A protein has these predicted regions:
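Short helix-initiation/N-cap motifs at beta->coil->alpha
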Residues: 52-63, 152-180
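Short, polar/charged alpha-helical segment
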Residues: 21, 27-51, 60, 64
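Ligand-binding "clamshell"
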Residues: 83-96, 109-112, 184, 189, ...
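Sec-dependent N-terminal signal peptides of Gram-positive bacterial secreted proteins and lipoproteins
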Residues: 1-13
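A bilobed periplasmic-binding-protein/Venus flytrap-type ligand-binding module shared by bacterial periplasmic
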Residues: 103-114, 219-232
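A conserved helix-loop-strand patch within extracytoplasmic ligand-binding domains
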Residues: 96-145, 248-249
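Periplasmic-binding protein-like
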Residues: 132-140, 242-263
Length: 270
């Protein structure tokens, strides 16, 4: 995860031409991305000065952004931000733009495709709301379970399963531990960043993974800020920076194309 903060000095507006210090906080592979971006020629061309910090907790990143000690963050999906806004009344984060899509995958050391997973198998699923809901939607798309018609993409839980014909057992885990428990369960649902950190490539190693469509668009990653900053021109330049040719070539090569660029208007996510 990663967080961008644009520190302003002398009380000057972010819309002036003065240099800004942008503090970026993140974790996992996103941290690597923004460490590179901070030193890039593309950032220099846009007169953006970034300082990157590694912060491991997503809620803390969002808290700091909503409270104003951080100006921008870039680590989460639209659904993660939406869940945060729902669960933290009085706060409001908004998306400045889209970045990329990281397919969530189903992994197994024992089986090579979902249909091979036997009745009663144990499937590990994230213990945080948005990742758990996303994982259940992944299992639904694989034809393994059925969910309520009004299933909430951000807060849905295993209690919303309407059909589980194979009687799968679900084990909730800290989603950052997925790669480490592959040998102790039948299958694990793992987010792309965590999988990559664990030496897994979602496009090559998963037995099933997401694709971008109307049902998964909520999982596109974003750059977020507090509501009051949504029209800040300097902050919006970060979106342009991310989509520059130089940065996209780096991301594609560094992460073996597992971070799929998405250049869509924010309205597409809603």
């Amino acid at each position: 995860m990663l967080l961008l903060v644009f520190g302003l000095s002398n009380g000057k507006s972010a819309d002036t031409n003065d240099s800004k210090t942008i503090v970026v906080g993140s974790t996992n592979t996103d941290y690597q991305v923004w460490k590179h971006i901070a030193k890039s020629n593309a950032a220099k061309k846009l007169n953006l000065h970034l300082k990157v910090k590694n912060i491991t907790n997503g809620v803390q990143l969002n808290d700091a952004t909503s409270q104003g000690s951080l100006d921008v963050n870039a680590f989460q999906s639209w659904s993660y931000m939406d869940t945060y806004n729902r669960q933290h009344k009085g706060t409001k984060l908004v998306a400045l733009g889209t970045t990329y899509y990281e397919p969530m995958g189903l992994y197994s050391k024992k089986y090579s495709k979902p249909t091979e997973i036997p009745d009663g198998a144990t499937i590990a699923i994230a213990d945080n709301p948005s990742q758990a809901a996303r994982g259940l939607l992944l299992l639904k798309s694989a034809g393994m379970i059925k969910l309520k018609s009004n299933f909430d993409y951000a807060t849905g839980t295993v209690s919303d399963i309407t059909e589980n014909p194979h009687k799968y057992q679900f084990k909730q885990i800290d989603d950052t531990t997925g790669p480490r428990i592959l040998n102790s369960v039948d299958a694990v649902i793992i987010s792309n960043s965590v999988a990559f950190d664990g030496g897994l490539n979602v496009l090559k190693d998963s037995i099933y993974h997401e694709t971008i469509n109307k049902n998964t668009r909520y999982n596109i990653n974003i750059i977020a800020t507090a509501k009051k900053n949504e029209n800040n021109k300097e902050y919006k330049k970060i979106v342009k920076l991310f989509h520059s040719k130089e940065i996209q070539e780096y991301v594609g090569k560094k992460f073996d194309h597992t971070k799929v660029e998405v250049k869509k208007p924010v309205s597409y996510l809603k």
